[in-house]
Amino acid sequence: MPNNYRLAKVSSLLKKEITLILQNDLENDLIRDHFVNISKIDLSGDLQHCKIYITSTAEEKVRKEIVENLNTAKSSIRHSLGKRIEMRRVPEIIFKDDVVLDKGLSVLKLLDELKNKNQNNNVEEKDAKS
C-alpha cells in the first residue's frame, strides 16, 4: 500500500494530465464551451480507482450532462492518460459533480438573507421607538 506522499504525488500528476486532456484532446463541444475544472481527486490506496470531482460555471442541469459526457468518454480519457504517464496500471476513473461549491454559495445566500432581515428588523424597531 503506497504511503500518503505517493498518493498525493500521483493524485497531483493525474489532476494535471487529465486537465490537459480535457482542454486539448477531448472532442466534446459541451465540455469545451463551459469552464470545466477538476476540483478534487480521490485516489484509492492501491492506485486502482480514481474519483474525479469537477466544477463548472454551467448551471446544475448542464453540469450533470457534462459529467455524463465525461463518464461516457472515460475510456478514451484513460487511454490518453496511459500514453502520458508511466504507471503499471492506469486507474479506473469515474467523474462526479462537485456540489461543495453550490452548497457554499447556498450558505452564503442564506447568510445574506438573514443579514438583510436582521437589518430590516433593526430599522423597524428604531422607527417604532421614534
From Swiss-Prot:
It comes from the Bacteria. GO terms for cellular component: cytosol. Its main location: cytoplasm. Pfam families: RBFA. InterPro entries: KH_dom-like_a/b, RbfA, RbfA_dom_sf, Ribosome-bd_factorA_CS. Keywords: Cytoplasm, Ribosome biogenesis. Gene3D superfamilies: 3.30.300.20. One of its GO terms (molecular function) is ribosomal small subunit binding. Monomer. Binds 30S ribosomal subunits, but not 50S ribosomal subunits or 70S ribosomes. One of several proteins that assist in the late maturation steps of the functional core of the 30S ribosomal subunit. Associates with free 30S ribosomal subunits (but not with 30S subunits that are part of 70S ribosomes or polysomes). Required for efficient processing of 16S rRNA. May interact with the 5'-terminal helix region of 16S rRNA. Belongs to the RbfA family. This is Ribosome-binding factor A. The lineage of its organism: Bacteria, Bacillati, Cyanobacteriota, Cyanophyceae, Synechococcales. The gene is rbfA.
